[in-house]
Amino acid sequence: MALNIENIIAEIKEATILELNDLVKAIEEEFGVTAAAPVAAAAASGEAAAAKDSFDVELTAAGDKKVGVIKVVREITGEGLKEAKAIVDNAPSVIKEGASEAEANEIKEKLEAAGASVTLK
């Protein structure tokens, strides 16, 4: 029996979603495997974080350049000097909740450039 990969691929392209679902189930049963295993492994390896749509930016430590970090915290939060200093002094503290991935990374870069340690949650 000759196996023609191109014919198999052509058949798969023409199949409906239901037919493909049945094919996957049949392959799983025949070979004792599961199609969900790679997805679970990817999620366990931290790729689930990439699927998040909102992040909390947490200041974990101010570092040596505390004054610069306070200025950046004021810029990000819109708080006054006293409030921004309290946030920095009481680290770890959340600077921004529910930020988009792009916004969270931008805030993280600004804080790290000022000398702070930051984590995204």
Swiss-Prot record:
GO terms for molecular function: mRNA binding; structural constituent of ribosome. GO terms for cellular component: cytosolic large ribosomal subunit. Pfam families: Ribosomal_L12, Ribosomal_L12_N. It comes from the Bacteria. InterPro entries: Ribosomal_bL12 (IPR000206), Ribosomal_bL12_C (IPR013823), Ribosomal_bL12_C/ClpS-like (IPR014719), Ribosomal_bL12_oligo (IPR008932), Ribosomal_bL12_oligo_N_sf (IPR036235). Keywords: Ribonucleoprotein, Ribosomal protein. Gene3D superfamilies: 3.30.1390.10, Single helix bin (1.20.5.710). GO terms for biological process: translation. PANTHER family: 39S RIBOSOMAL PROTEIN L12, LARGE RIBOSOMAL SUBUNIT PROTEIN BL12M. Homodimer. Part of the ribosomal stalk of the 50S ribosomal subunit. Forms a multimeric L10(L12)X complex, where L10 forms an elongated spine to which 2 to 4 L12 dimers bind in a sequential fashion. Binds GTP-bound translation factors. Forms part of the ribosomal stalk which helps the ribosome interact with GTP-bound translation factors. Is thus essential for accurate translation. Belongs to the bacterial ribosomal protein bL12 family. This is Large ribosomal subunit protein bL12. The lineage of its organism: Bacteria, Bacillati, Bacillota, Bacilli, Lactobacillales.
